[in-house]
């Protein structure tokens, strides 16, 4: 089906472009959300009459989106999840989880604005793209961790696989083992003690 785009649509075209798309995509997404019109002769004439108004609305919406983008660009949200020692999550972090974390931080978005290619399945920092307007995209960072303390360590850039507590415990164990097993001490067995007494 041929449609006239009423706004920029990613991977499809700019406002005013006439593009051919599958019927289901046109009916269920583009037409339903008022992102396009069927490319009939009447609608082409209607679009030419609406063009100046649409462009003015788009510029105003883009300006508002730029203000919102400045407020949330570069934010870091922390999402706490259970995970294995290797860092694999038991489950995943989806668009809804990211929306909830941003909402707790005072940012209200729709699920269509959070562009996540696939759910997050491991601990770490993940770059998330947010489309606040069809022509304005920004990035936020989602830090997925097992605890707040681990999230702080991830944000500082520390290696979470080698925990500091584990390293300290290992150092203490080595020190204790060194005191217990003195390498300079002679091996005193009852047989060597008896031999030294006979002399």
UniProtKB/Swiss-Prot annotation:
A Gene Ontology biological process term: translation
Compositional bias ranges of the Basic and acidic residues kind: 149-166
Function text: Binds to the 23S rRNA.
Encoding gene, per UniProt annotation: rplI
GO cellular component, one term: ribonucleoprotein complex
Signal peptide annotation: none
Biased composition (Acidic residues): 181-191
Protein's name in the database: Large ribosomal subunit protein bL9
Database matches in InterPro entries: Ribosomal_bL9 (IPR000244), Ribosomal_bL9/RNase_H1_N (IPR009027), Ribosomal_bL9_bac/chp (IPR020594), Ribosomal_bL9_C (IPR020069), Ribosomal_bL9_C_sf (IPR036791), Ribosomal_bL9_N (IPR020070), Ribosomal_bL9_N_sf (IPR036935)
Keyword Electron transport attributed: no
Keyword set, alphabetical order: Ribonucleoprotein, Ribosomal protein, RNA-binding, rRNA-binding
Annotated family: Belongs to the bacterial ribosomal protein bL9 family.
GO molecular function per UniProt: rRNA binding; structural constituent of ribosome
NCBIfam families referenced in this protein's UniProt entry, alphabetically: L9
Record HAMAP family: Ribosomal_bL9
Region spans: Disordered: 149-199
Pfam families, A to Z: Ribosomal_L9_C, Ribosomal_L9_N
